[in-house]
Amino acid sequence: MDPNCSCATDGSCSCAGSCKCKECKCTTCKKSCCSCCPVGCAKCSQGCVCKEASDKCSCCA
């Protein structure tokens, strides 16, 4: 589990909009887990890691 989110690693994702996940590794996303990822990011399920001081994450950049 990410300490900043209710997402379980490799689990399904239903994070709230206020979620501050730093490393979302959900296999399915009902919405974006990372604030830096767009909701429709098709690669979110592949393991999104938000970059510090950036509005983009490693999978959707």
UniProtKB/Swiss-Prot annotation:
Residues 30-61 are annotated as: Alpha. Keywords: Acetylation, Metal-binding, Metal-thiolate cluster, Phosphoprotein. A divalent metal cation 5 binds at residues 34, 36-37, 50. A divalent metal cation 1 binds at residues 5, 7, 21, 24. Gene3D superfamilies: Metallothionein Isoform II. The keyword Metal-binding applies. A divalent metal cation 6 binds at residues 37, 41, 44, 60. A divalent metal cation 4 binds at residues 33-34, 44, 48. Signal peptide: none annotated. A divalent metal cation 7 binds at residues 50, 57, 59-60. It holds the Pfam family Metallothio. SUPFAM superfamilies: Metallothionein (SSF57868). One of its GO terms (molecular function) is zinc ion binding. GO terms for biological process: cellular response to cadmium ion; cellular response to copper ion; cellular response to zinc ion; detoxification of copper ion; intracellular zinc ion homeostasis; negative regulation of growth; nitric oxide mediated signal transduction; response to bacterium. The modification N-acetylmethionine is found at residue 1. PROSITE patterns: METALLOTHIONEIN_VRT. A divalent metal cation 2 binds at residues 7, 13, 15, 26. Belongs to the metallothionein superfamily. Type 1 family. Metallothioneins have a high content of cysteine residues that bind various heavy metals; these proteins are transcriptionally regulated by both heavy metals and glucocorticoids. Class I metallothioneins contain 2 metal-binding domains: four divalent ions are chelated within cluster A of the alpha domain and are coordinated via cysteinyl thiolate bridges to 11 cysteine ligands. Cluster B, the corresponding region within the beta domain, can ligate three divalent ions to 9 cysteines. This is Metallothionein-2. The gene is MT2.
